[in-house]
Amino acid sequence: MMERKREMGIAYFARRIKQPRGIWVKMTFIVVLGLCFVFFWSFLSSSASTFNVQRESFDDIAEPVSSRTKSAHEVSESSKLHERGKVESGSKSKEGKKVGGSSVHKHETKKKKEHAVSHPHKKKDVPKPVVEEVVVKEDQEHEEAESDDSDQSNKEDGEEGTESDGNEGESDGNGDGSVDDSSASVDEEVEEKNEEVTVNEISKKRKRKGPVFDPKAEYSWRLCNTRSKHNYMPCIDNDGLIGRLQSYRHRERSCPKKPVMCLVPLPHDGYDPPVSWPESKSKILYKNVAHPKLAAYIKKHNWVNETGEYLSFPQNQTTFNGNVLQYLEFIQEMVPDIEWGKNVRIVLDIGCSDSSFVAALLDKDVLTVSLGLKDDLVDLAQVALERGFPTFVSSLASRRLPFPSGVFDTIHCAACGVHWHSHGGKLLLEMNRILRPNGYFILSSNNDKIEDDEAMTALTASICWNILAHKTEEASEMGVRIYQKPESNDIYELRRKKNPPLCEDNENPDAAWYVPMKTCIYEIPSAIEQHGAEWPEEWPKRLETYPEWLTSKEKAMEDTNHWNAMVNKSYLTGLGIDWLHIRNVMDMTAIYGGFGASLVKQNVWVMNVVPVHSPDTLPFIYERGLLGIYHDWCEPFGTYPRSYDLLHADHLFSRLKNRCKQPASIVVEMDRLTRPGGWVVVRDKVEILEPLEEILRSLHWEIRMTYAQDKEGMLCAQKTLWRP
């Protein structure tokens, strides 16, 4: 039986062998295909592993500036790859490292890897910039760090990556879009957008290859068709179709979805060169700021008069019903420790009115920046800018102001109309965040309601502010209260009720870009390595003082020496700029504030902008007694058109190559910010400056100077009155 089965089996296989060979070819092909699949799968798995190792190794590069940065960096170890976008600092899983001195920003939920890459101390071989004889290595290293950061940000970045142009907004970037300004849910929408991006989507992003500006692009300019016309502020004005049926301005900053590529028109009656400083303190050209509601406002107030073609500002007529100098002296009499221009150098003034307070302090070497509230439909902030006073426009509602913690020596509110005790006191807690320990909060008002007074007293007591004085100034008839923030954390432990509570240790007090306000108290810095732990030196000594918490002192000193030499040898004499007509200046990529510091002796003020994706050096800029602000240049800036006489951009475009959808929109924004007759000075790679020059020519700017050496260059251009 067994023998028969064996014979049958042999016969069966013999028949199979005689069948066509096609089936064997197919089986062989399937086996080979399977082996190829296994090979490629193992290859891809290896690549992913290598990528992870490479990202984790960035921690070796990071070098925090202060211990505040260091401790927060440790907290951020648990951050996830899929976390991105604009952060709510209250969430432990979303909050990253503190940005005390100059580590990378943590305004958004970025990963620890990004923190490491964007640090300025990473070095690699790149062409050495030689635009001038004096070259600073810090500038190179900062640029290299930004380049490395951009490379990685496309794989992990959220709204600051390659699709970072105004994600917060709702219109189409031309003033024609559809808007549903549901302001109460703005921050919720931001979170939803952040969650939509998966790990797979992030990993698909790659570094943009090729030039920053599209060489094939042809620009056909047109005027913006917006509700606010010649005063268009893209992220503040509500210009969508639906928005026009609602409020005039957004409750919170909300930018167009698409890059703004239209040009803001000139005022209805044209624009003439502004009155030069210091004459502009007392008068400006009315046509440059003409506004229907401003015309009605002028008729009701005596501190501003229409005199022919000018608006004049009588020195003896102020909102203080008397001499503002008396008001300042009254404050010093109540609190002798306040020494204007010495221990008090940097002041934030809430709201814009007649700017007499700002002007009087300027004469005492006090630099005051005014917060023009978005509800100011009279546009008094624009009047202040035209007069030459530091001003920016923002809402004061639910998001933090774009400043680091503990940087203002004094905050002033004179009849500013802010209800500090409302919404759980979060507005006052925001002032507590940005006020320097031991700093002063001055509150002046004409009519105090008993209910408001009681609520304010309870709130200030709950956050342990000490009321130093409460008197009525006779000349102005204003009740003046002066509070002082604690200098240590001991007093917080003595509170019977821990409400508001102390903020969590992992919450970053310096995170400010699209970050909601918190109803908690941040602890006072106590270690010498933390920024804000000690009061700065008196002015002007603080300008050249490098605090203990600054770990890159040598680089900061090199930066200062570099820009002093550059400004004195080139900028003041070699560019053809008439500095007698320059007052409002912006440094679009401030590092240590060296460029602004070099202009201190000139009759100018400088807004030092620290991009939110770059190392956070803004606390040090304030420590020096200079002004600054956080900003993302993929979005329009928070100010009126024609605000600045000079824009300075040092390697701005090369650092934003992989962050902004359309870098040309930054040039459009520069055109919006600059006054006719104003200047831009751009230092960057030659491959960037050449197409940039063509874009400026298409905007009918006058190219006054170009300079190139090796791969680096400089471009100096002046804006004209041309509009399409």
UniProtKB/Swiss-Prot annotation:
Q: Where in the cell is it found?
A: Golgi apparatus membrane
The similarity annotation says: Belongs to the methyltransferase superfamily.
Q: What is this protein called?
A: Probable methyltransferase PMT28
- Pfam short name (any one): Methyltransf_29
One GO cellular component term of this record is: Golgi membrane
MF terms from GO for this chain are:
methyltransferase activity
Q: Where is the composition biased (Basic residues)?
A: 107-125
User: Could you tell me which PANTHER family the record lists for this protein?
Assistant: METHYLTRANSFERASE PMT28-RELATED (PTHR10108:SF1102), SAM-DEPENDENT METHYLTRANSFERASE (PTHR10108)
GO terms under biological process: methylation
Kindly list the residue ranges recorded as spanning the membrane: 23-43
Sequence ranges of Basic and acidic residues compositional bias: 71-98, 126-140
Q: Which CDD domains match?
A: AdoMet_MTases (cd02440)
Q: Any idea which UniProt keywords this protein has?
A: Glycoprotein, Golgi apparatus, Membrane, Methyltransferase, Signal-anchor, Transferase, Transmembrane, Transmembrane helix
**Domain of life, source organism:** Eukaryota
Q: Where is the composition biased (Acidic residues)?
A: 141-173
Membrane topology (Lumenal):
44-724
Task: Classify the protein's membrane topology as the record does.
Answer: Single-pass type II membrane protein
